[in-house]
Design a protein with these regions (language model features):
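Conserved HxN/HPN-centered segment at the entrance to the catalytic loop
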Residues: 59-68
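Activation segment signature within eukaryotic-like protein kinase domains
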Residues: 105-106
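Conserved short submotifs of the Hanks-type protein kinase catalytic core
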Residues: 73-87, 91
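Conserved catalytic-loop aspartate of Hanks-type protein kinases
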Residues: 182
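Catalytic-loop of the protein kinase fold
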Residues: 117-133
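Conserved activation segment of eukaryotic-like protein kinases, specifically the C-terminal portion
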Residues: 157-170
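ATP-binding glycine-rich loop module of kinase domains
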Residues: 15-53
Length: 234
């Protein structure tokens, strides 16, 4: 019933613009309001969608807003903010970031993750494609399809999800992921923004090297333990 309602609203009030992504588990489309012209993202995915239900109650300038979440027979439908801008991956097609540019992006990313981690939300897929810079220059963290809620007494994740090269070792079933998992990915992201390569191929050799090295330690206890600590060391 809920899904029929949301599909009816989309059909009556919005016009399809384009398909952003389609996999066996998710479909992401952009729609434009017929009268107001405002664009939104409609995400249909399999699974419980518990992270999106949690995100619906949160608001942060560096996180794409989730407007509504509705259960369906096979998963959930999510209506979320459309971010007009380019991803870090798009920018890297034209050149590398300066150290000051990296500090600006990562500082905002740390602010977003500080809120998420305080609600036990682990993103698990931080990479250039999931970090956007909007038309006003604001950083926006997007795509929570791989995210999970941290469970204090769980020994490991039920699913190994992430992007190879950015995923921390514990994402492959060694231990449960936690906020330090996202810190690992931030370290890889910083190195890619500065060199175009992951640290194991070409480690950045400037002042941010020590931050990257600490973020990407194999053992979580040897990394920064939270994003506040990471941000202080940028």
């Amino acid at each position: 019933m809920g899904n029929n309602w949301i599909d009816t609203v989309i059909k009556e009030q919005y016009q399809f613009v384009r398909l952003l992504k389609r996999t066996d588990k998710t479909e992401i489309c952009v729609f434009r309001h017929r009268e107001l012209g405002k664009q939104i993202v409609k995400r249909t995915l399999k699974g419980s969608g518990e992270v999106y239900f949690a995100l619906r109650t949160l608001s942060h300038p560096n996180i794409a807003n989730v407007y509504d979440v509705v259960k369906t027979e096979t998963g959930v439908t999510v209506l979320e903010e459309y971010v007009d801008g380019q991803t870090v991956a798009d920018y890297l097609q034209t050149g590398l970031y300066s150290p000051s540019g990296v500090r600006k992006v990562i500082s905002s990313l740390c602010d977003a993750l500080d809120l998420l981690h305080s609600h036990q939300i682990i993103h698990k897929d931080i990479k250039p494609e999931n970090v956007m810079i909007d038309s006003n220059g604001n950083v926006k963290l997007i795509d929570f399809d791989a995210a999970r809620i941290y469970k204090p007494f769980q020994s490991q994740d039920t699913q190994a999800i992430g992007t190879m090269g950015y995923a921390a070792p514990e994402q492959y079933g060694i231990n449960q992921t936690d906020e330090r998992t996202d810190i690992y990915a931030i370290g890889v992201l910083m190195n890619v923004m500065l060199t175009g390569q992951p640290p194991e191929i070409r480690l950045y050799n400037g002042r941010l090297k020590r931050v990257i090295v600490k973020c990407t330690q194999t053992i979580p206890d040897n990394r920064y333990q939270n994003v506040k600590e990471l941000k202080r060391n940028l």
